[in-house]
């Protein structure tokens, strides 16, 4: 071997170097190759304002694992990266930056402001991409896209104009969610609902012409009273049948409003009378449409009251509320105030309370657009993992409203609509139409609004591949295979990609959506700036390495479930990396200078066949788990195999043979060949999770290989199936564990070797122990081994160890307290009594017998038989000691 591993593993020595090697050699890049099957994942584009956080780290680690796995399986694997222009977030950042320079946005033209945005993007937009590289992400950076690059922008304009011509995009006055701080409309998906303590203000509305008669309404928002255009009651409510059609005096105004009957009103809720404010409530808006009510906007874009509020004009909405309530009380119209907890909509970005108000906005009509997206999940064309996400998905699609896509911002895709300066005629066109088709005027002004950021993101799976052009990339790599994303953006992005894929491409954009949960702190709290509990992934990488972070994020992680982050787990992952490194160094040191050849099956020892059989089964099991997207389960199996079976058992068993290269070269060769072969297989199985350390070790171990990344993923080999040897070595392991346990209990140091008697009535098992003494002679610290059918010739003071199928005896004579041994056996008996009770309880449970898989039931029956045998042996030993 021309190269050696350093004595200690330091991620800083290898990670940047290896990543540069991978990128320089184009290992991440994918081109159309019809001889290979494609596998495509599109990266959820991080915002250009973003910095790598734990959510990004988990999301991209999962994607990278799948891409590396499929690449090793021989697929033409494309991981399509890119970033999102993030209109609101970027605009806020740029405005802050300008403010620090003493510049106000209002002092700039639109073009000047956009220049500042592009400058900001150039300076900061690539930051998160560099951070994703530090994580080891093997995305095809040669194909990196941006949601506002020329190709993506063309796709956005194409979709907008197509949907407009189809009648599925329209402009109209509707209730929208208005953010008074960001001063833009936002979609329903961008509204979070927080439970807040508020009040019901009960207010009397005087009945016109009937002195002293009032209709009592209850409202949580008295300041919207100025926009009331009716009071509604349920037509079935007997209490109010006589006032339907009458007129009420609207308090604190000189207006009168009618009493109407509408089934929308819940007669059991509140007073059964509801103030109707069509311009400031989505439900009231619908009632207003049914009854042809006037829509009166009373709140300005900045959440101050307008002139319709009379003397309260100019006040903030909450100041108005307080002043109005005081005045209603003075007028004797405030009946009572009742505490009330209710959900309040807030903007998910700035957490300002959203103001529902009527605005002229652009909308996507959803009633027809959503149908294929619903059917695609129902018929299994698209699979959501975990399956419980189906309920969340359908809950949203069943209650979907038209999507408000216009935003009152400058940074983003400008709406391709043009208005005639003379007659106001509107034309939707990608290019400026030049002249008005109605009056011929040549002065056309573009709509000032931009599109919701998620409009362009919804096209991401196909716009990144060249759509609307019919490119070879699009034909080959679309549809994508898997989408990996957090469950928190199922409404923002996942559903919109699905219906956009069906509408524009005629097929689903991917066949599987793998959801992951949030990464929380060790106390289960969401990481946030306000709590100060955020953990920077780059800090973790700097301290422990990217591989340790990746392993920590995936181990024990189940699809859709939140996970807790513990520093102790990162340390454990780092310790695992050290163990892999040290084991590899030991193997390579012993291989150095030795001419290795492939041994015949007869030259392999039982332990060699056992570990080959184990890694063979691991390859099969891990592949099955990976194919089912059970990444956490797969890596746990790989981890356990490497740490336990390979390092703690096989290396220790084989170690003695590696020292006998001259004395027994055939045996040494078989051991060294097995060590190298199994380590190679294990490194490949570990590579998708821990790419850096596996690359460094693999390329040192297999110096003729370029990279582990393009090596073949391990497959199950029938010739490595050795069930008899597996069973034999497991018996030997039971023996070693039993002896080690009793030595620990008796405080007998490993250096003190003892004679070992193995008794078993099973002749086949006796043969196993006779033929495999080399496996356990050193691990059990024995001086002499005697295998026999019974305990003839064994001294009475010998300490016994009961293992499945056999009893071990260690004649420790005066080293062991006889009474202490009896105490130990009684403890063992108590332990077995509990296990027997548990096992019998399960096997007498009808629910378990009927619902559990047959193999599970059989497994429990086998356990019971084993416990019963062990109990008989313990009781026999106790009887002998009386």
Feature roles, as predicted:
Residues 254-260, 448-478, 644, 648-651:
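Active-site-adjacent "gating/activation" loops or surface patches in catalytic cores
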Residues 31-94, 147, 156, 217-219, ...:
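N-terminal catalytic cores of NTP/NDP-binding nucleotidyl/phosphoryl-transfer enzymes
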Residues 34-36, 44-45, 80-91, 144-152, ...:
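Short, solvent-exposed turn/loop segments enriched in Gly/Ser/Thr/Pro and often Arg
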Residues 1-54, 77, 335, 348, ...:
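Non-catalytic terminal extensions that flank enzyme cores
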Residues 57-65, 215-251, 274-281, 291-298, ...:
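Extended active-site and interfacial segments that coordinate phosphate-rich ligands
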Residues 68-76, 97-110, 130, 134-139, ...:
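Secondary-structure transition/capping motifs at alpha-helix termini
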Residues 3, 8, 17, 21-25, ...:
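Residue patterns forming the tRNA-binding/recognition surfaces of aminoacyl-tRNA synthetases
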Residues 202, 395-455, 459, 503-546, ...:
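Feature 926 captures the class I aminoacyl-tRNA synthetase adenylation module centered on the KMSKS loop
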């Amino acid at each position: 071997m021309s190269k050696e591993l350093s004595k200690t593993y330091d991620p800083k020595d290898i990670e940047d170097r290896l990543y540069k090697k991978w990128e320089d050699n184009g290992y991440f890049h994918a081109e159309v190759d019809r001889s290979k099957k494609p596998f495509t994942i599109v990266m959820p584009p991080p915002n250009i304002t973003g910095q790598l956080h734990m959510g990004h780290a988990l999301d991209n680690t999962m994607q990278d694992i799948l891409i590396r796995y499929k690449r090793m399986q021989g697929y033409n694997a494309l991981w399509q990266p890119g970033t999102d222009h993030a209109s609101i977030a970027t605009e806020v950042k740029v405005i802050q930056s300008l403010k620090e320079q003493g510049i106000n946005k209002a002092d700039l033209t639109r073009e000047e402001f956009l220049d500042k945005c592009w400058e900001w993007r150039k300076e900061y937009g690539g930051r998160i991409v560099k951070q994703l590289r530090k994580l080891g992400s093997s995305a095809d950076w040669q194909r990196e896209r941006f949601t506002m690059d020329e190709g993506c922008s063309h796709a956005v304009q194409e979709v907008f104009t197509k949907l407009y011509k189809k009648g599925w995009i329209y402009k109209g006055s509707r209730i929208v969610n208005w953010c008074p701080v960001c001063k833009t409309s936002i979609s329903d998906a961008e509204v979070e609902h927080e439970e807040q303590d508020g009040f019901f203000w009960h207010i009397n509305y005087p009945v016109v012409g009937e002195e002293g008669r009032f209709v009592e309404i209850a409202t949580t928002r008295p300041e919207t009273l100025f926009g009331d255009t009716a009071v509604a009651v349920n037509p079935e409510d007997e209490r109010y049948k006589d006032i339907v059609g009458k007129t009420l005096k609207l308090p604190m105004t000189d207006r009168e409003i009618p009493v109407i009957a509408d089934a929308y009103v819940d007669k059991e809720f509140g007073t059964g009378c509801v103030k109707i404010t069509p311009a400031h409530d989505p439900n009231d808006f619908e009632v207003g449409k049914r009854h042809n009510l006037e829509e009166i906007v009373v709140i300005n874009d900045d959440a101050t009251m307008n002139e319709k509020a009379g003397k309260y004009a100019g006040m903030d909405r909450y100041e108005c509320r307080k002043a109005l309530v005081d005045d209603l009380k003075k007028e004797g119209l405030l009946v009572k105030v009742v505490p009330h907890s209710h959900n309040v909509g807030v903007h998910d970005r700035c957490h300002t309370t959203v103001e529902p108000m009527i605005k002229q906005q652009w909308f996507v009509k959803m009633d027809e657009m959503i149908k294929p997206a619903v059917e695609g999940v129902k018929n299994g064309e698209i699979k959501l993992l975990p399956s419980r996400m189906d309920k969340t998905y359908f809950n949203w699609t069943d209650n979907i409203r038209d999507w408000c896509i216009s935003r009152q911002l400058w940074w983003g895709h400008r709406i391709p609509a043009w208005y005639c300066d003379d007659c106001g005629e509107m034309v939707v066109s990608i290019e400026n139409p030049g002249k008005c088709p109605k009056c011929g005027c040549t002065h056309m002004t573009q709509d000032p609004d931009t599109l919701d950021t998620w409009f362009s993101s919804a096209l991401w799976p196909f716009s990144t591949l060249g759509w609307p052009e019919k490119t070879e990339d699009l034909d080959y790599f679309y549809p994508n295979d898997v989408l990996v994303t957090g469950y928190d953006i199922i409404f923002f992005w996942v559903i919109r990609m699905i219906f956009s894929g069906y509408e524009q491409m005629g097929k689903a954009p991917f066949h599987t959506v793998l959801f992951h949960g949030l990464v929380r702190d060790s106390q289960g709290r969401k990481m946030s700036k306000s709590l100060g509990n955020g953990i920077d992934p780059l800090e973790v990488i700097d301290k422990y390495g990217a591989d340790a972070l990746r392993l920590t994020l995936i181990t024990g992680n189940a699809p859709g479930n939140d996970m807790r982050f513990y520093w102790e787990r990162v340390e454990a992952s780092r310790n695992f990396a050290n163990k892999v490194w040290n084991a590899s160094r030991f193997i390579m040191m012993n291989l150095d200078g030795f001419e290795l050849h492939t041994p015949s099956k007869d030259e392999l020892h039982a332990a060699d066949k056992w570990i080959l059989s184990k890694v063979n089964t691991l390859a099969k099991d891990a592949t099955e788990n990976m194919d089912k997207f059970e990444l956490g389960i797969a890596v746990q199996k790989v981890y356990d195999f490497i740490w336990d079976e390979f390092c703690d058992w096989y290396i220790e068993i084989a170690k003695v043979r590696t020292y006998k290269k001259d004395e027994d070269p055939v045996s040494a060769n078989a051991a060294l060949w097995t060590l190298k072969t199994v380590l190679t297989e294990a490194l490949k199985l570990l590579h998708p999770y821990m790419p850096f350390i596996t690359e460094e070790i693999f390329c040192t171990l297999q110096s003729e290989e370029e990279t582990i990344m393009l090596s073949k993923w391990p497959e199950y080999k029938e010739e490595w199936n050795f069930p008899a040897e597996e069973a034999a070595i497991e018996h030997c392991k039971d023996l070693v564990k039993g002896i080690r346990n009793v030595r620990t209990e008796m405080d007998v140091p490993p250096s003190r070797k003892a004679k070992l008697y193995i008794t078993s009535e099973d002749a086949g098992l006796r043969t196993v122990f006779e033929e495999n003494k080399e496996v356990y002679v050193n691990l059990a610290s024995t001086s002499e081994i005697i295998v026999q059918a019974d305990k003839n010739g064994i001294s009475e003071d010998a300490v016994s160890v009961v293992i499945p199928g056999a009893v071990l005896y260690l004649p420790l004579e005066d080293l062991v307290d006889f009474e202490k041994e009896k105490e130990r056996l009684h403890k063992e008996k108590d332990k077995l009594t509990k296990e027997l009770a548990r096992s019998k309880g399960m096997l007498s449970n009808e629910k378990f017998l009927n619902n559990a898989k047959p193999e599970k039931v059989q497994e429990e029956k086998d356990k019971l038989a084993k416990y019963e045998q062990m109990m008989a042996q313990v009781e026999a030993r106790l009887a002998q000691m009386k």
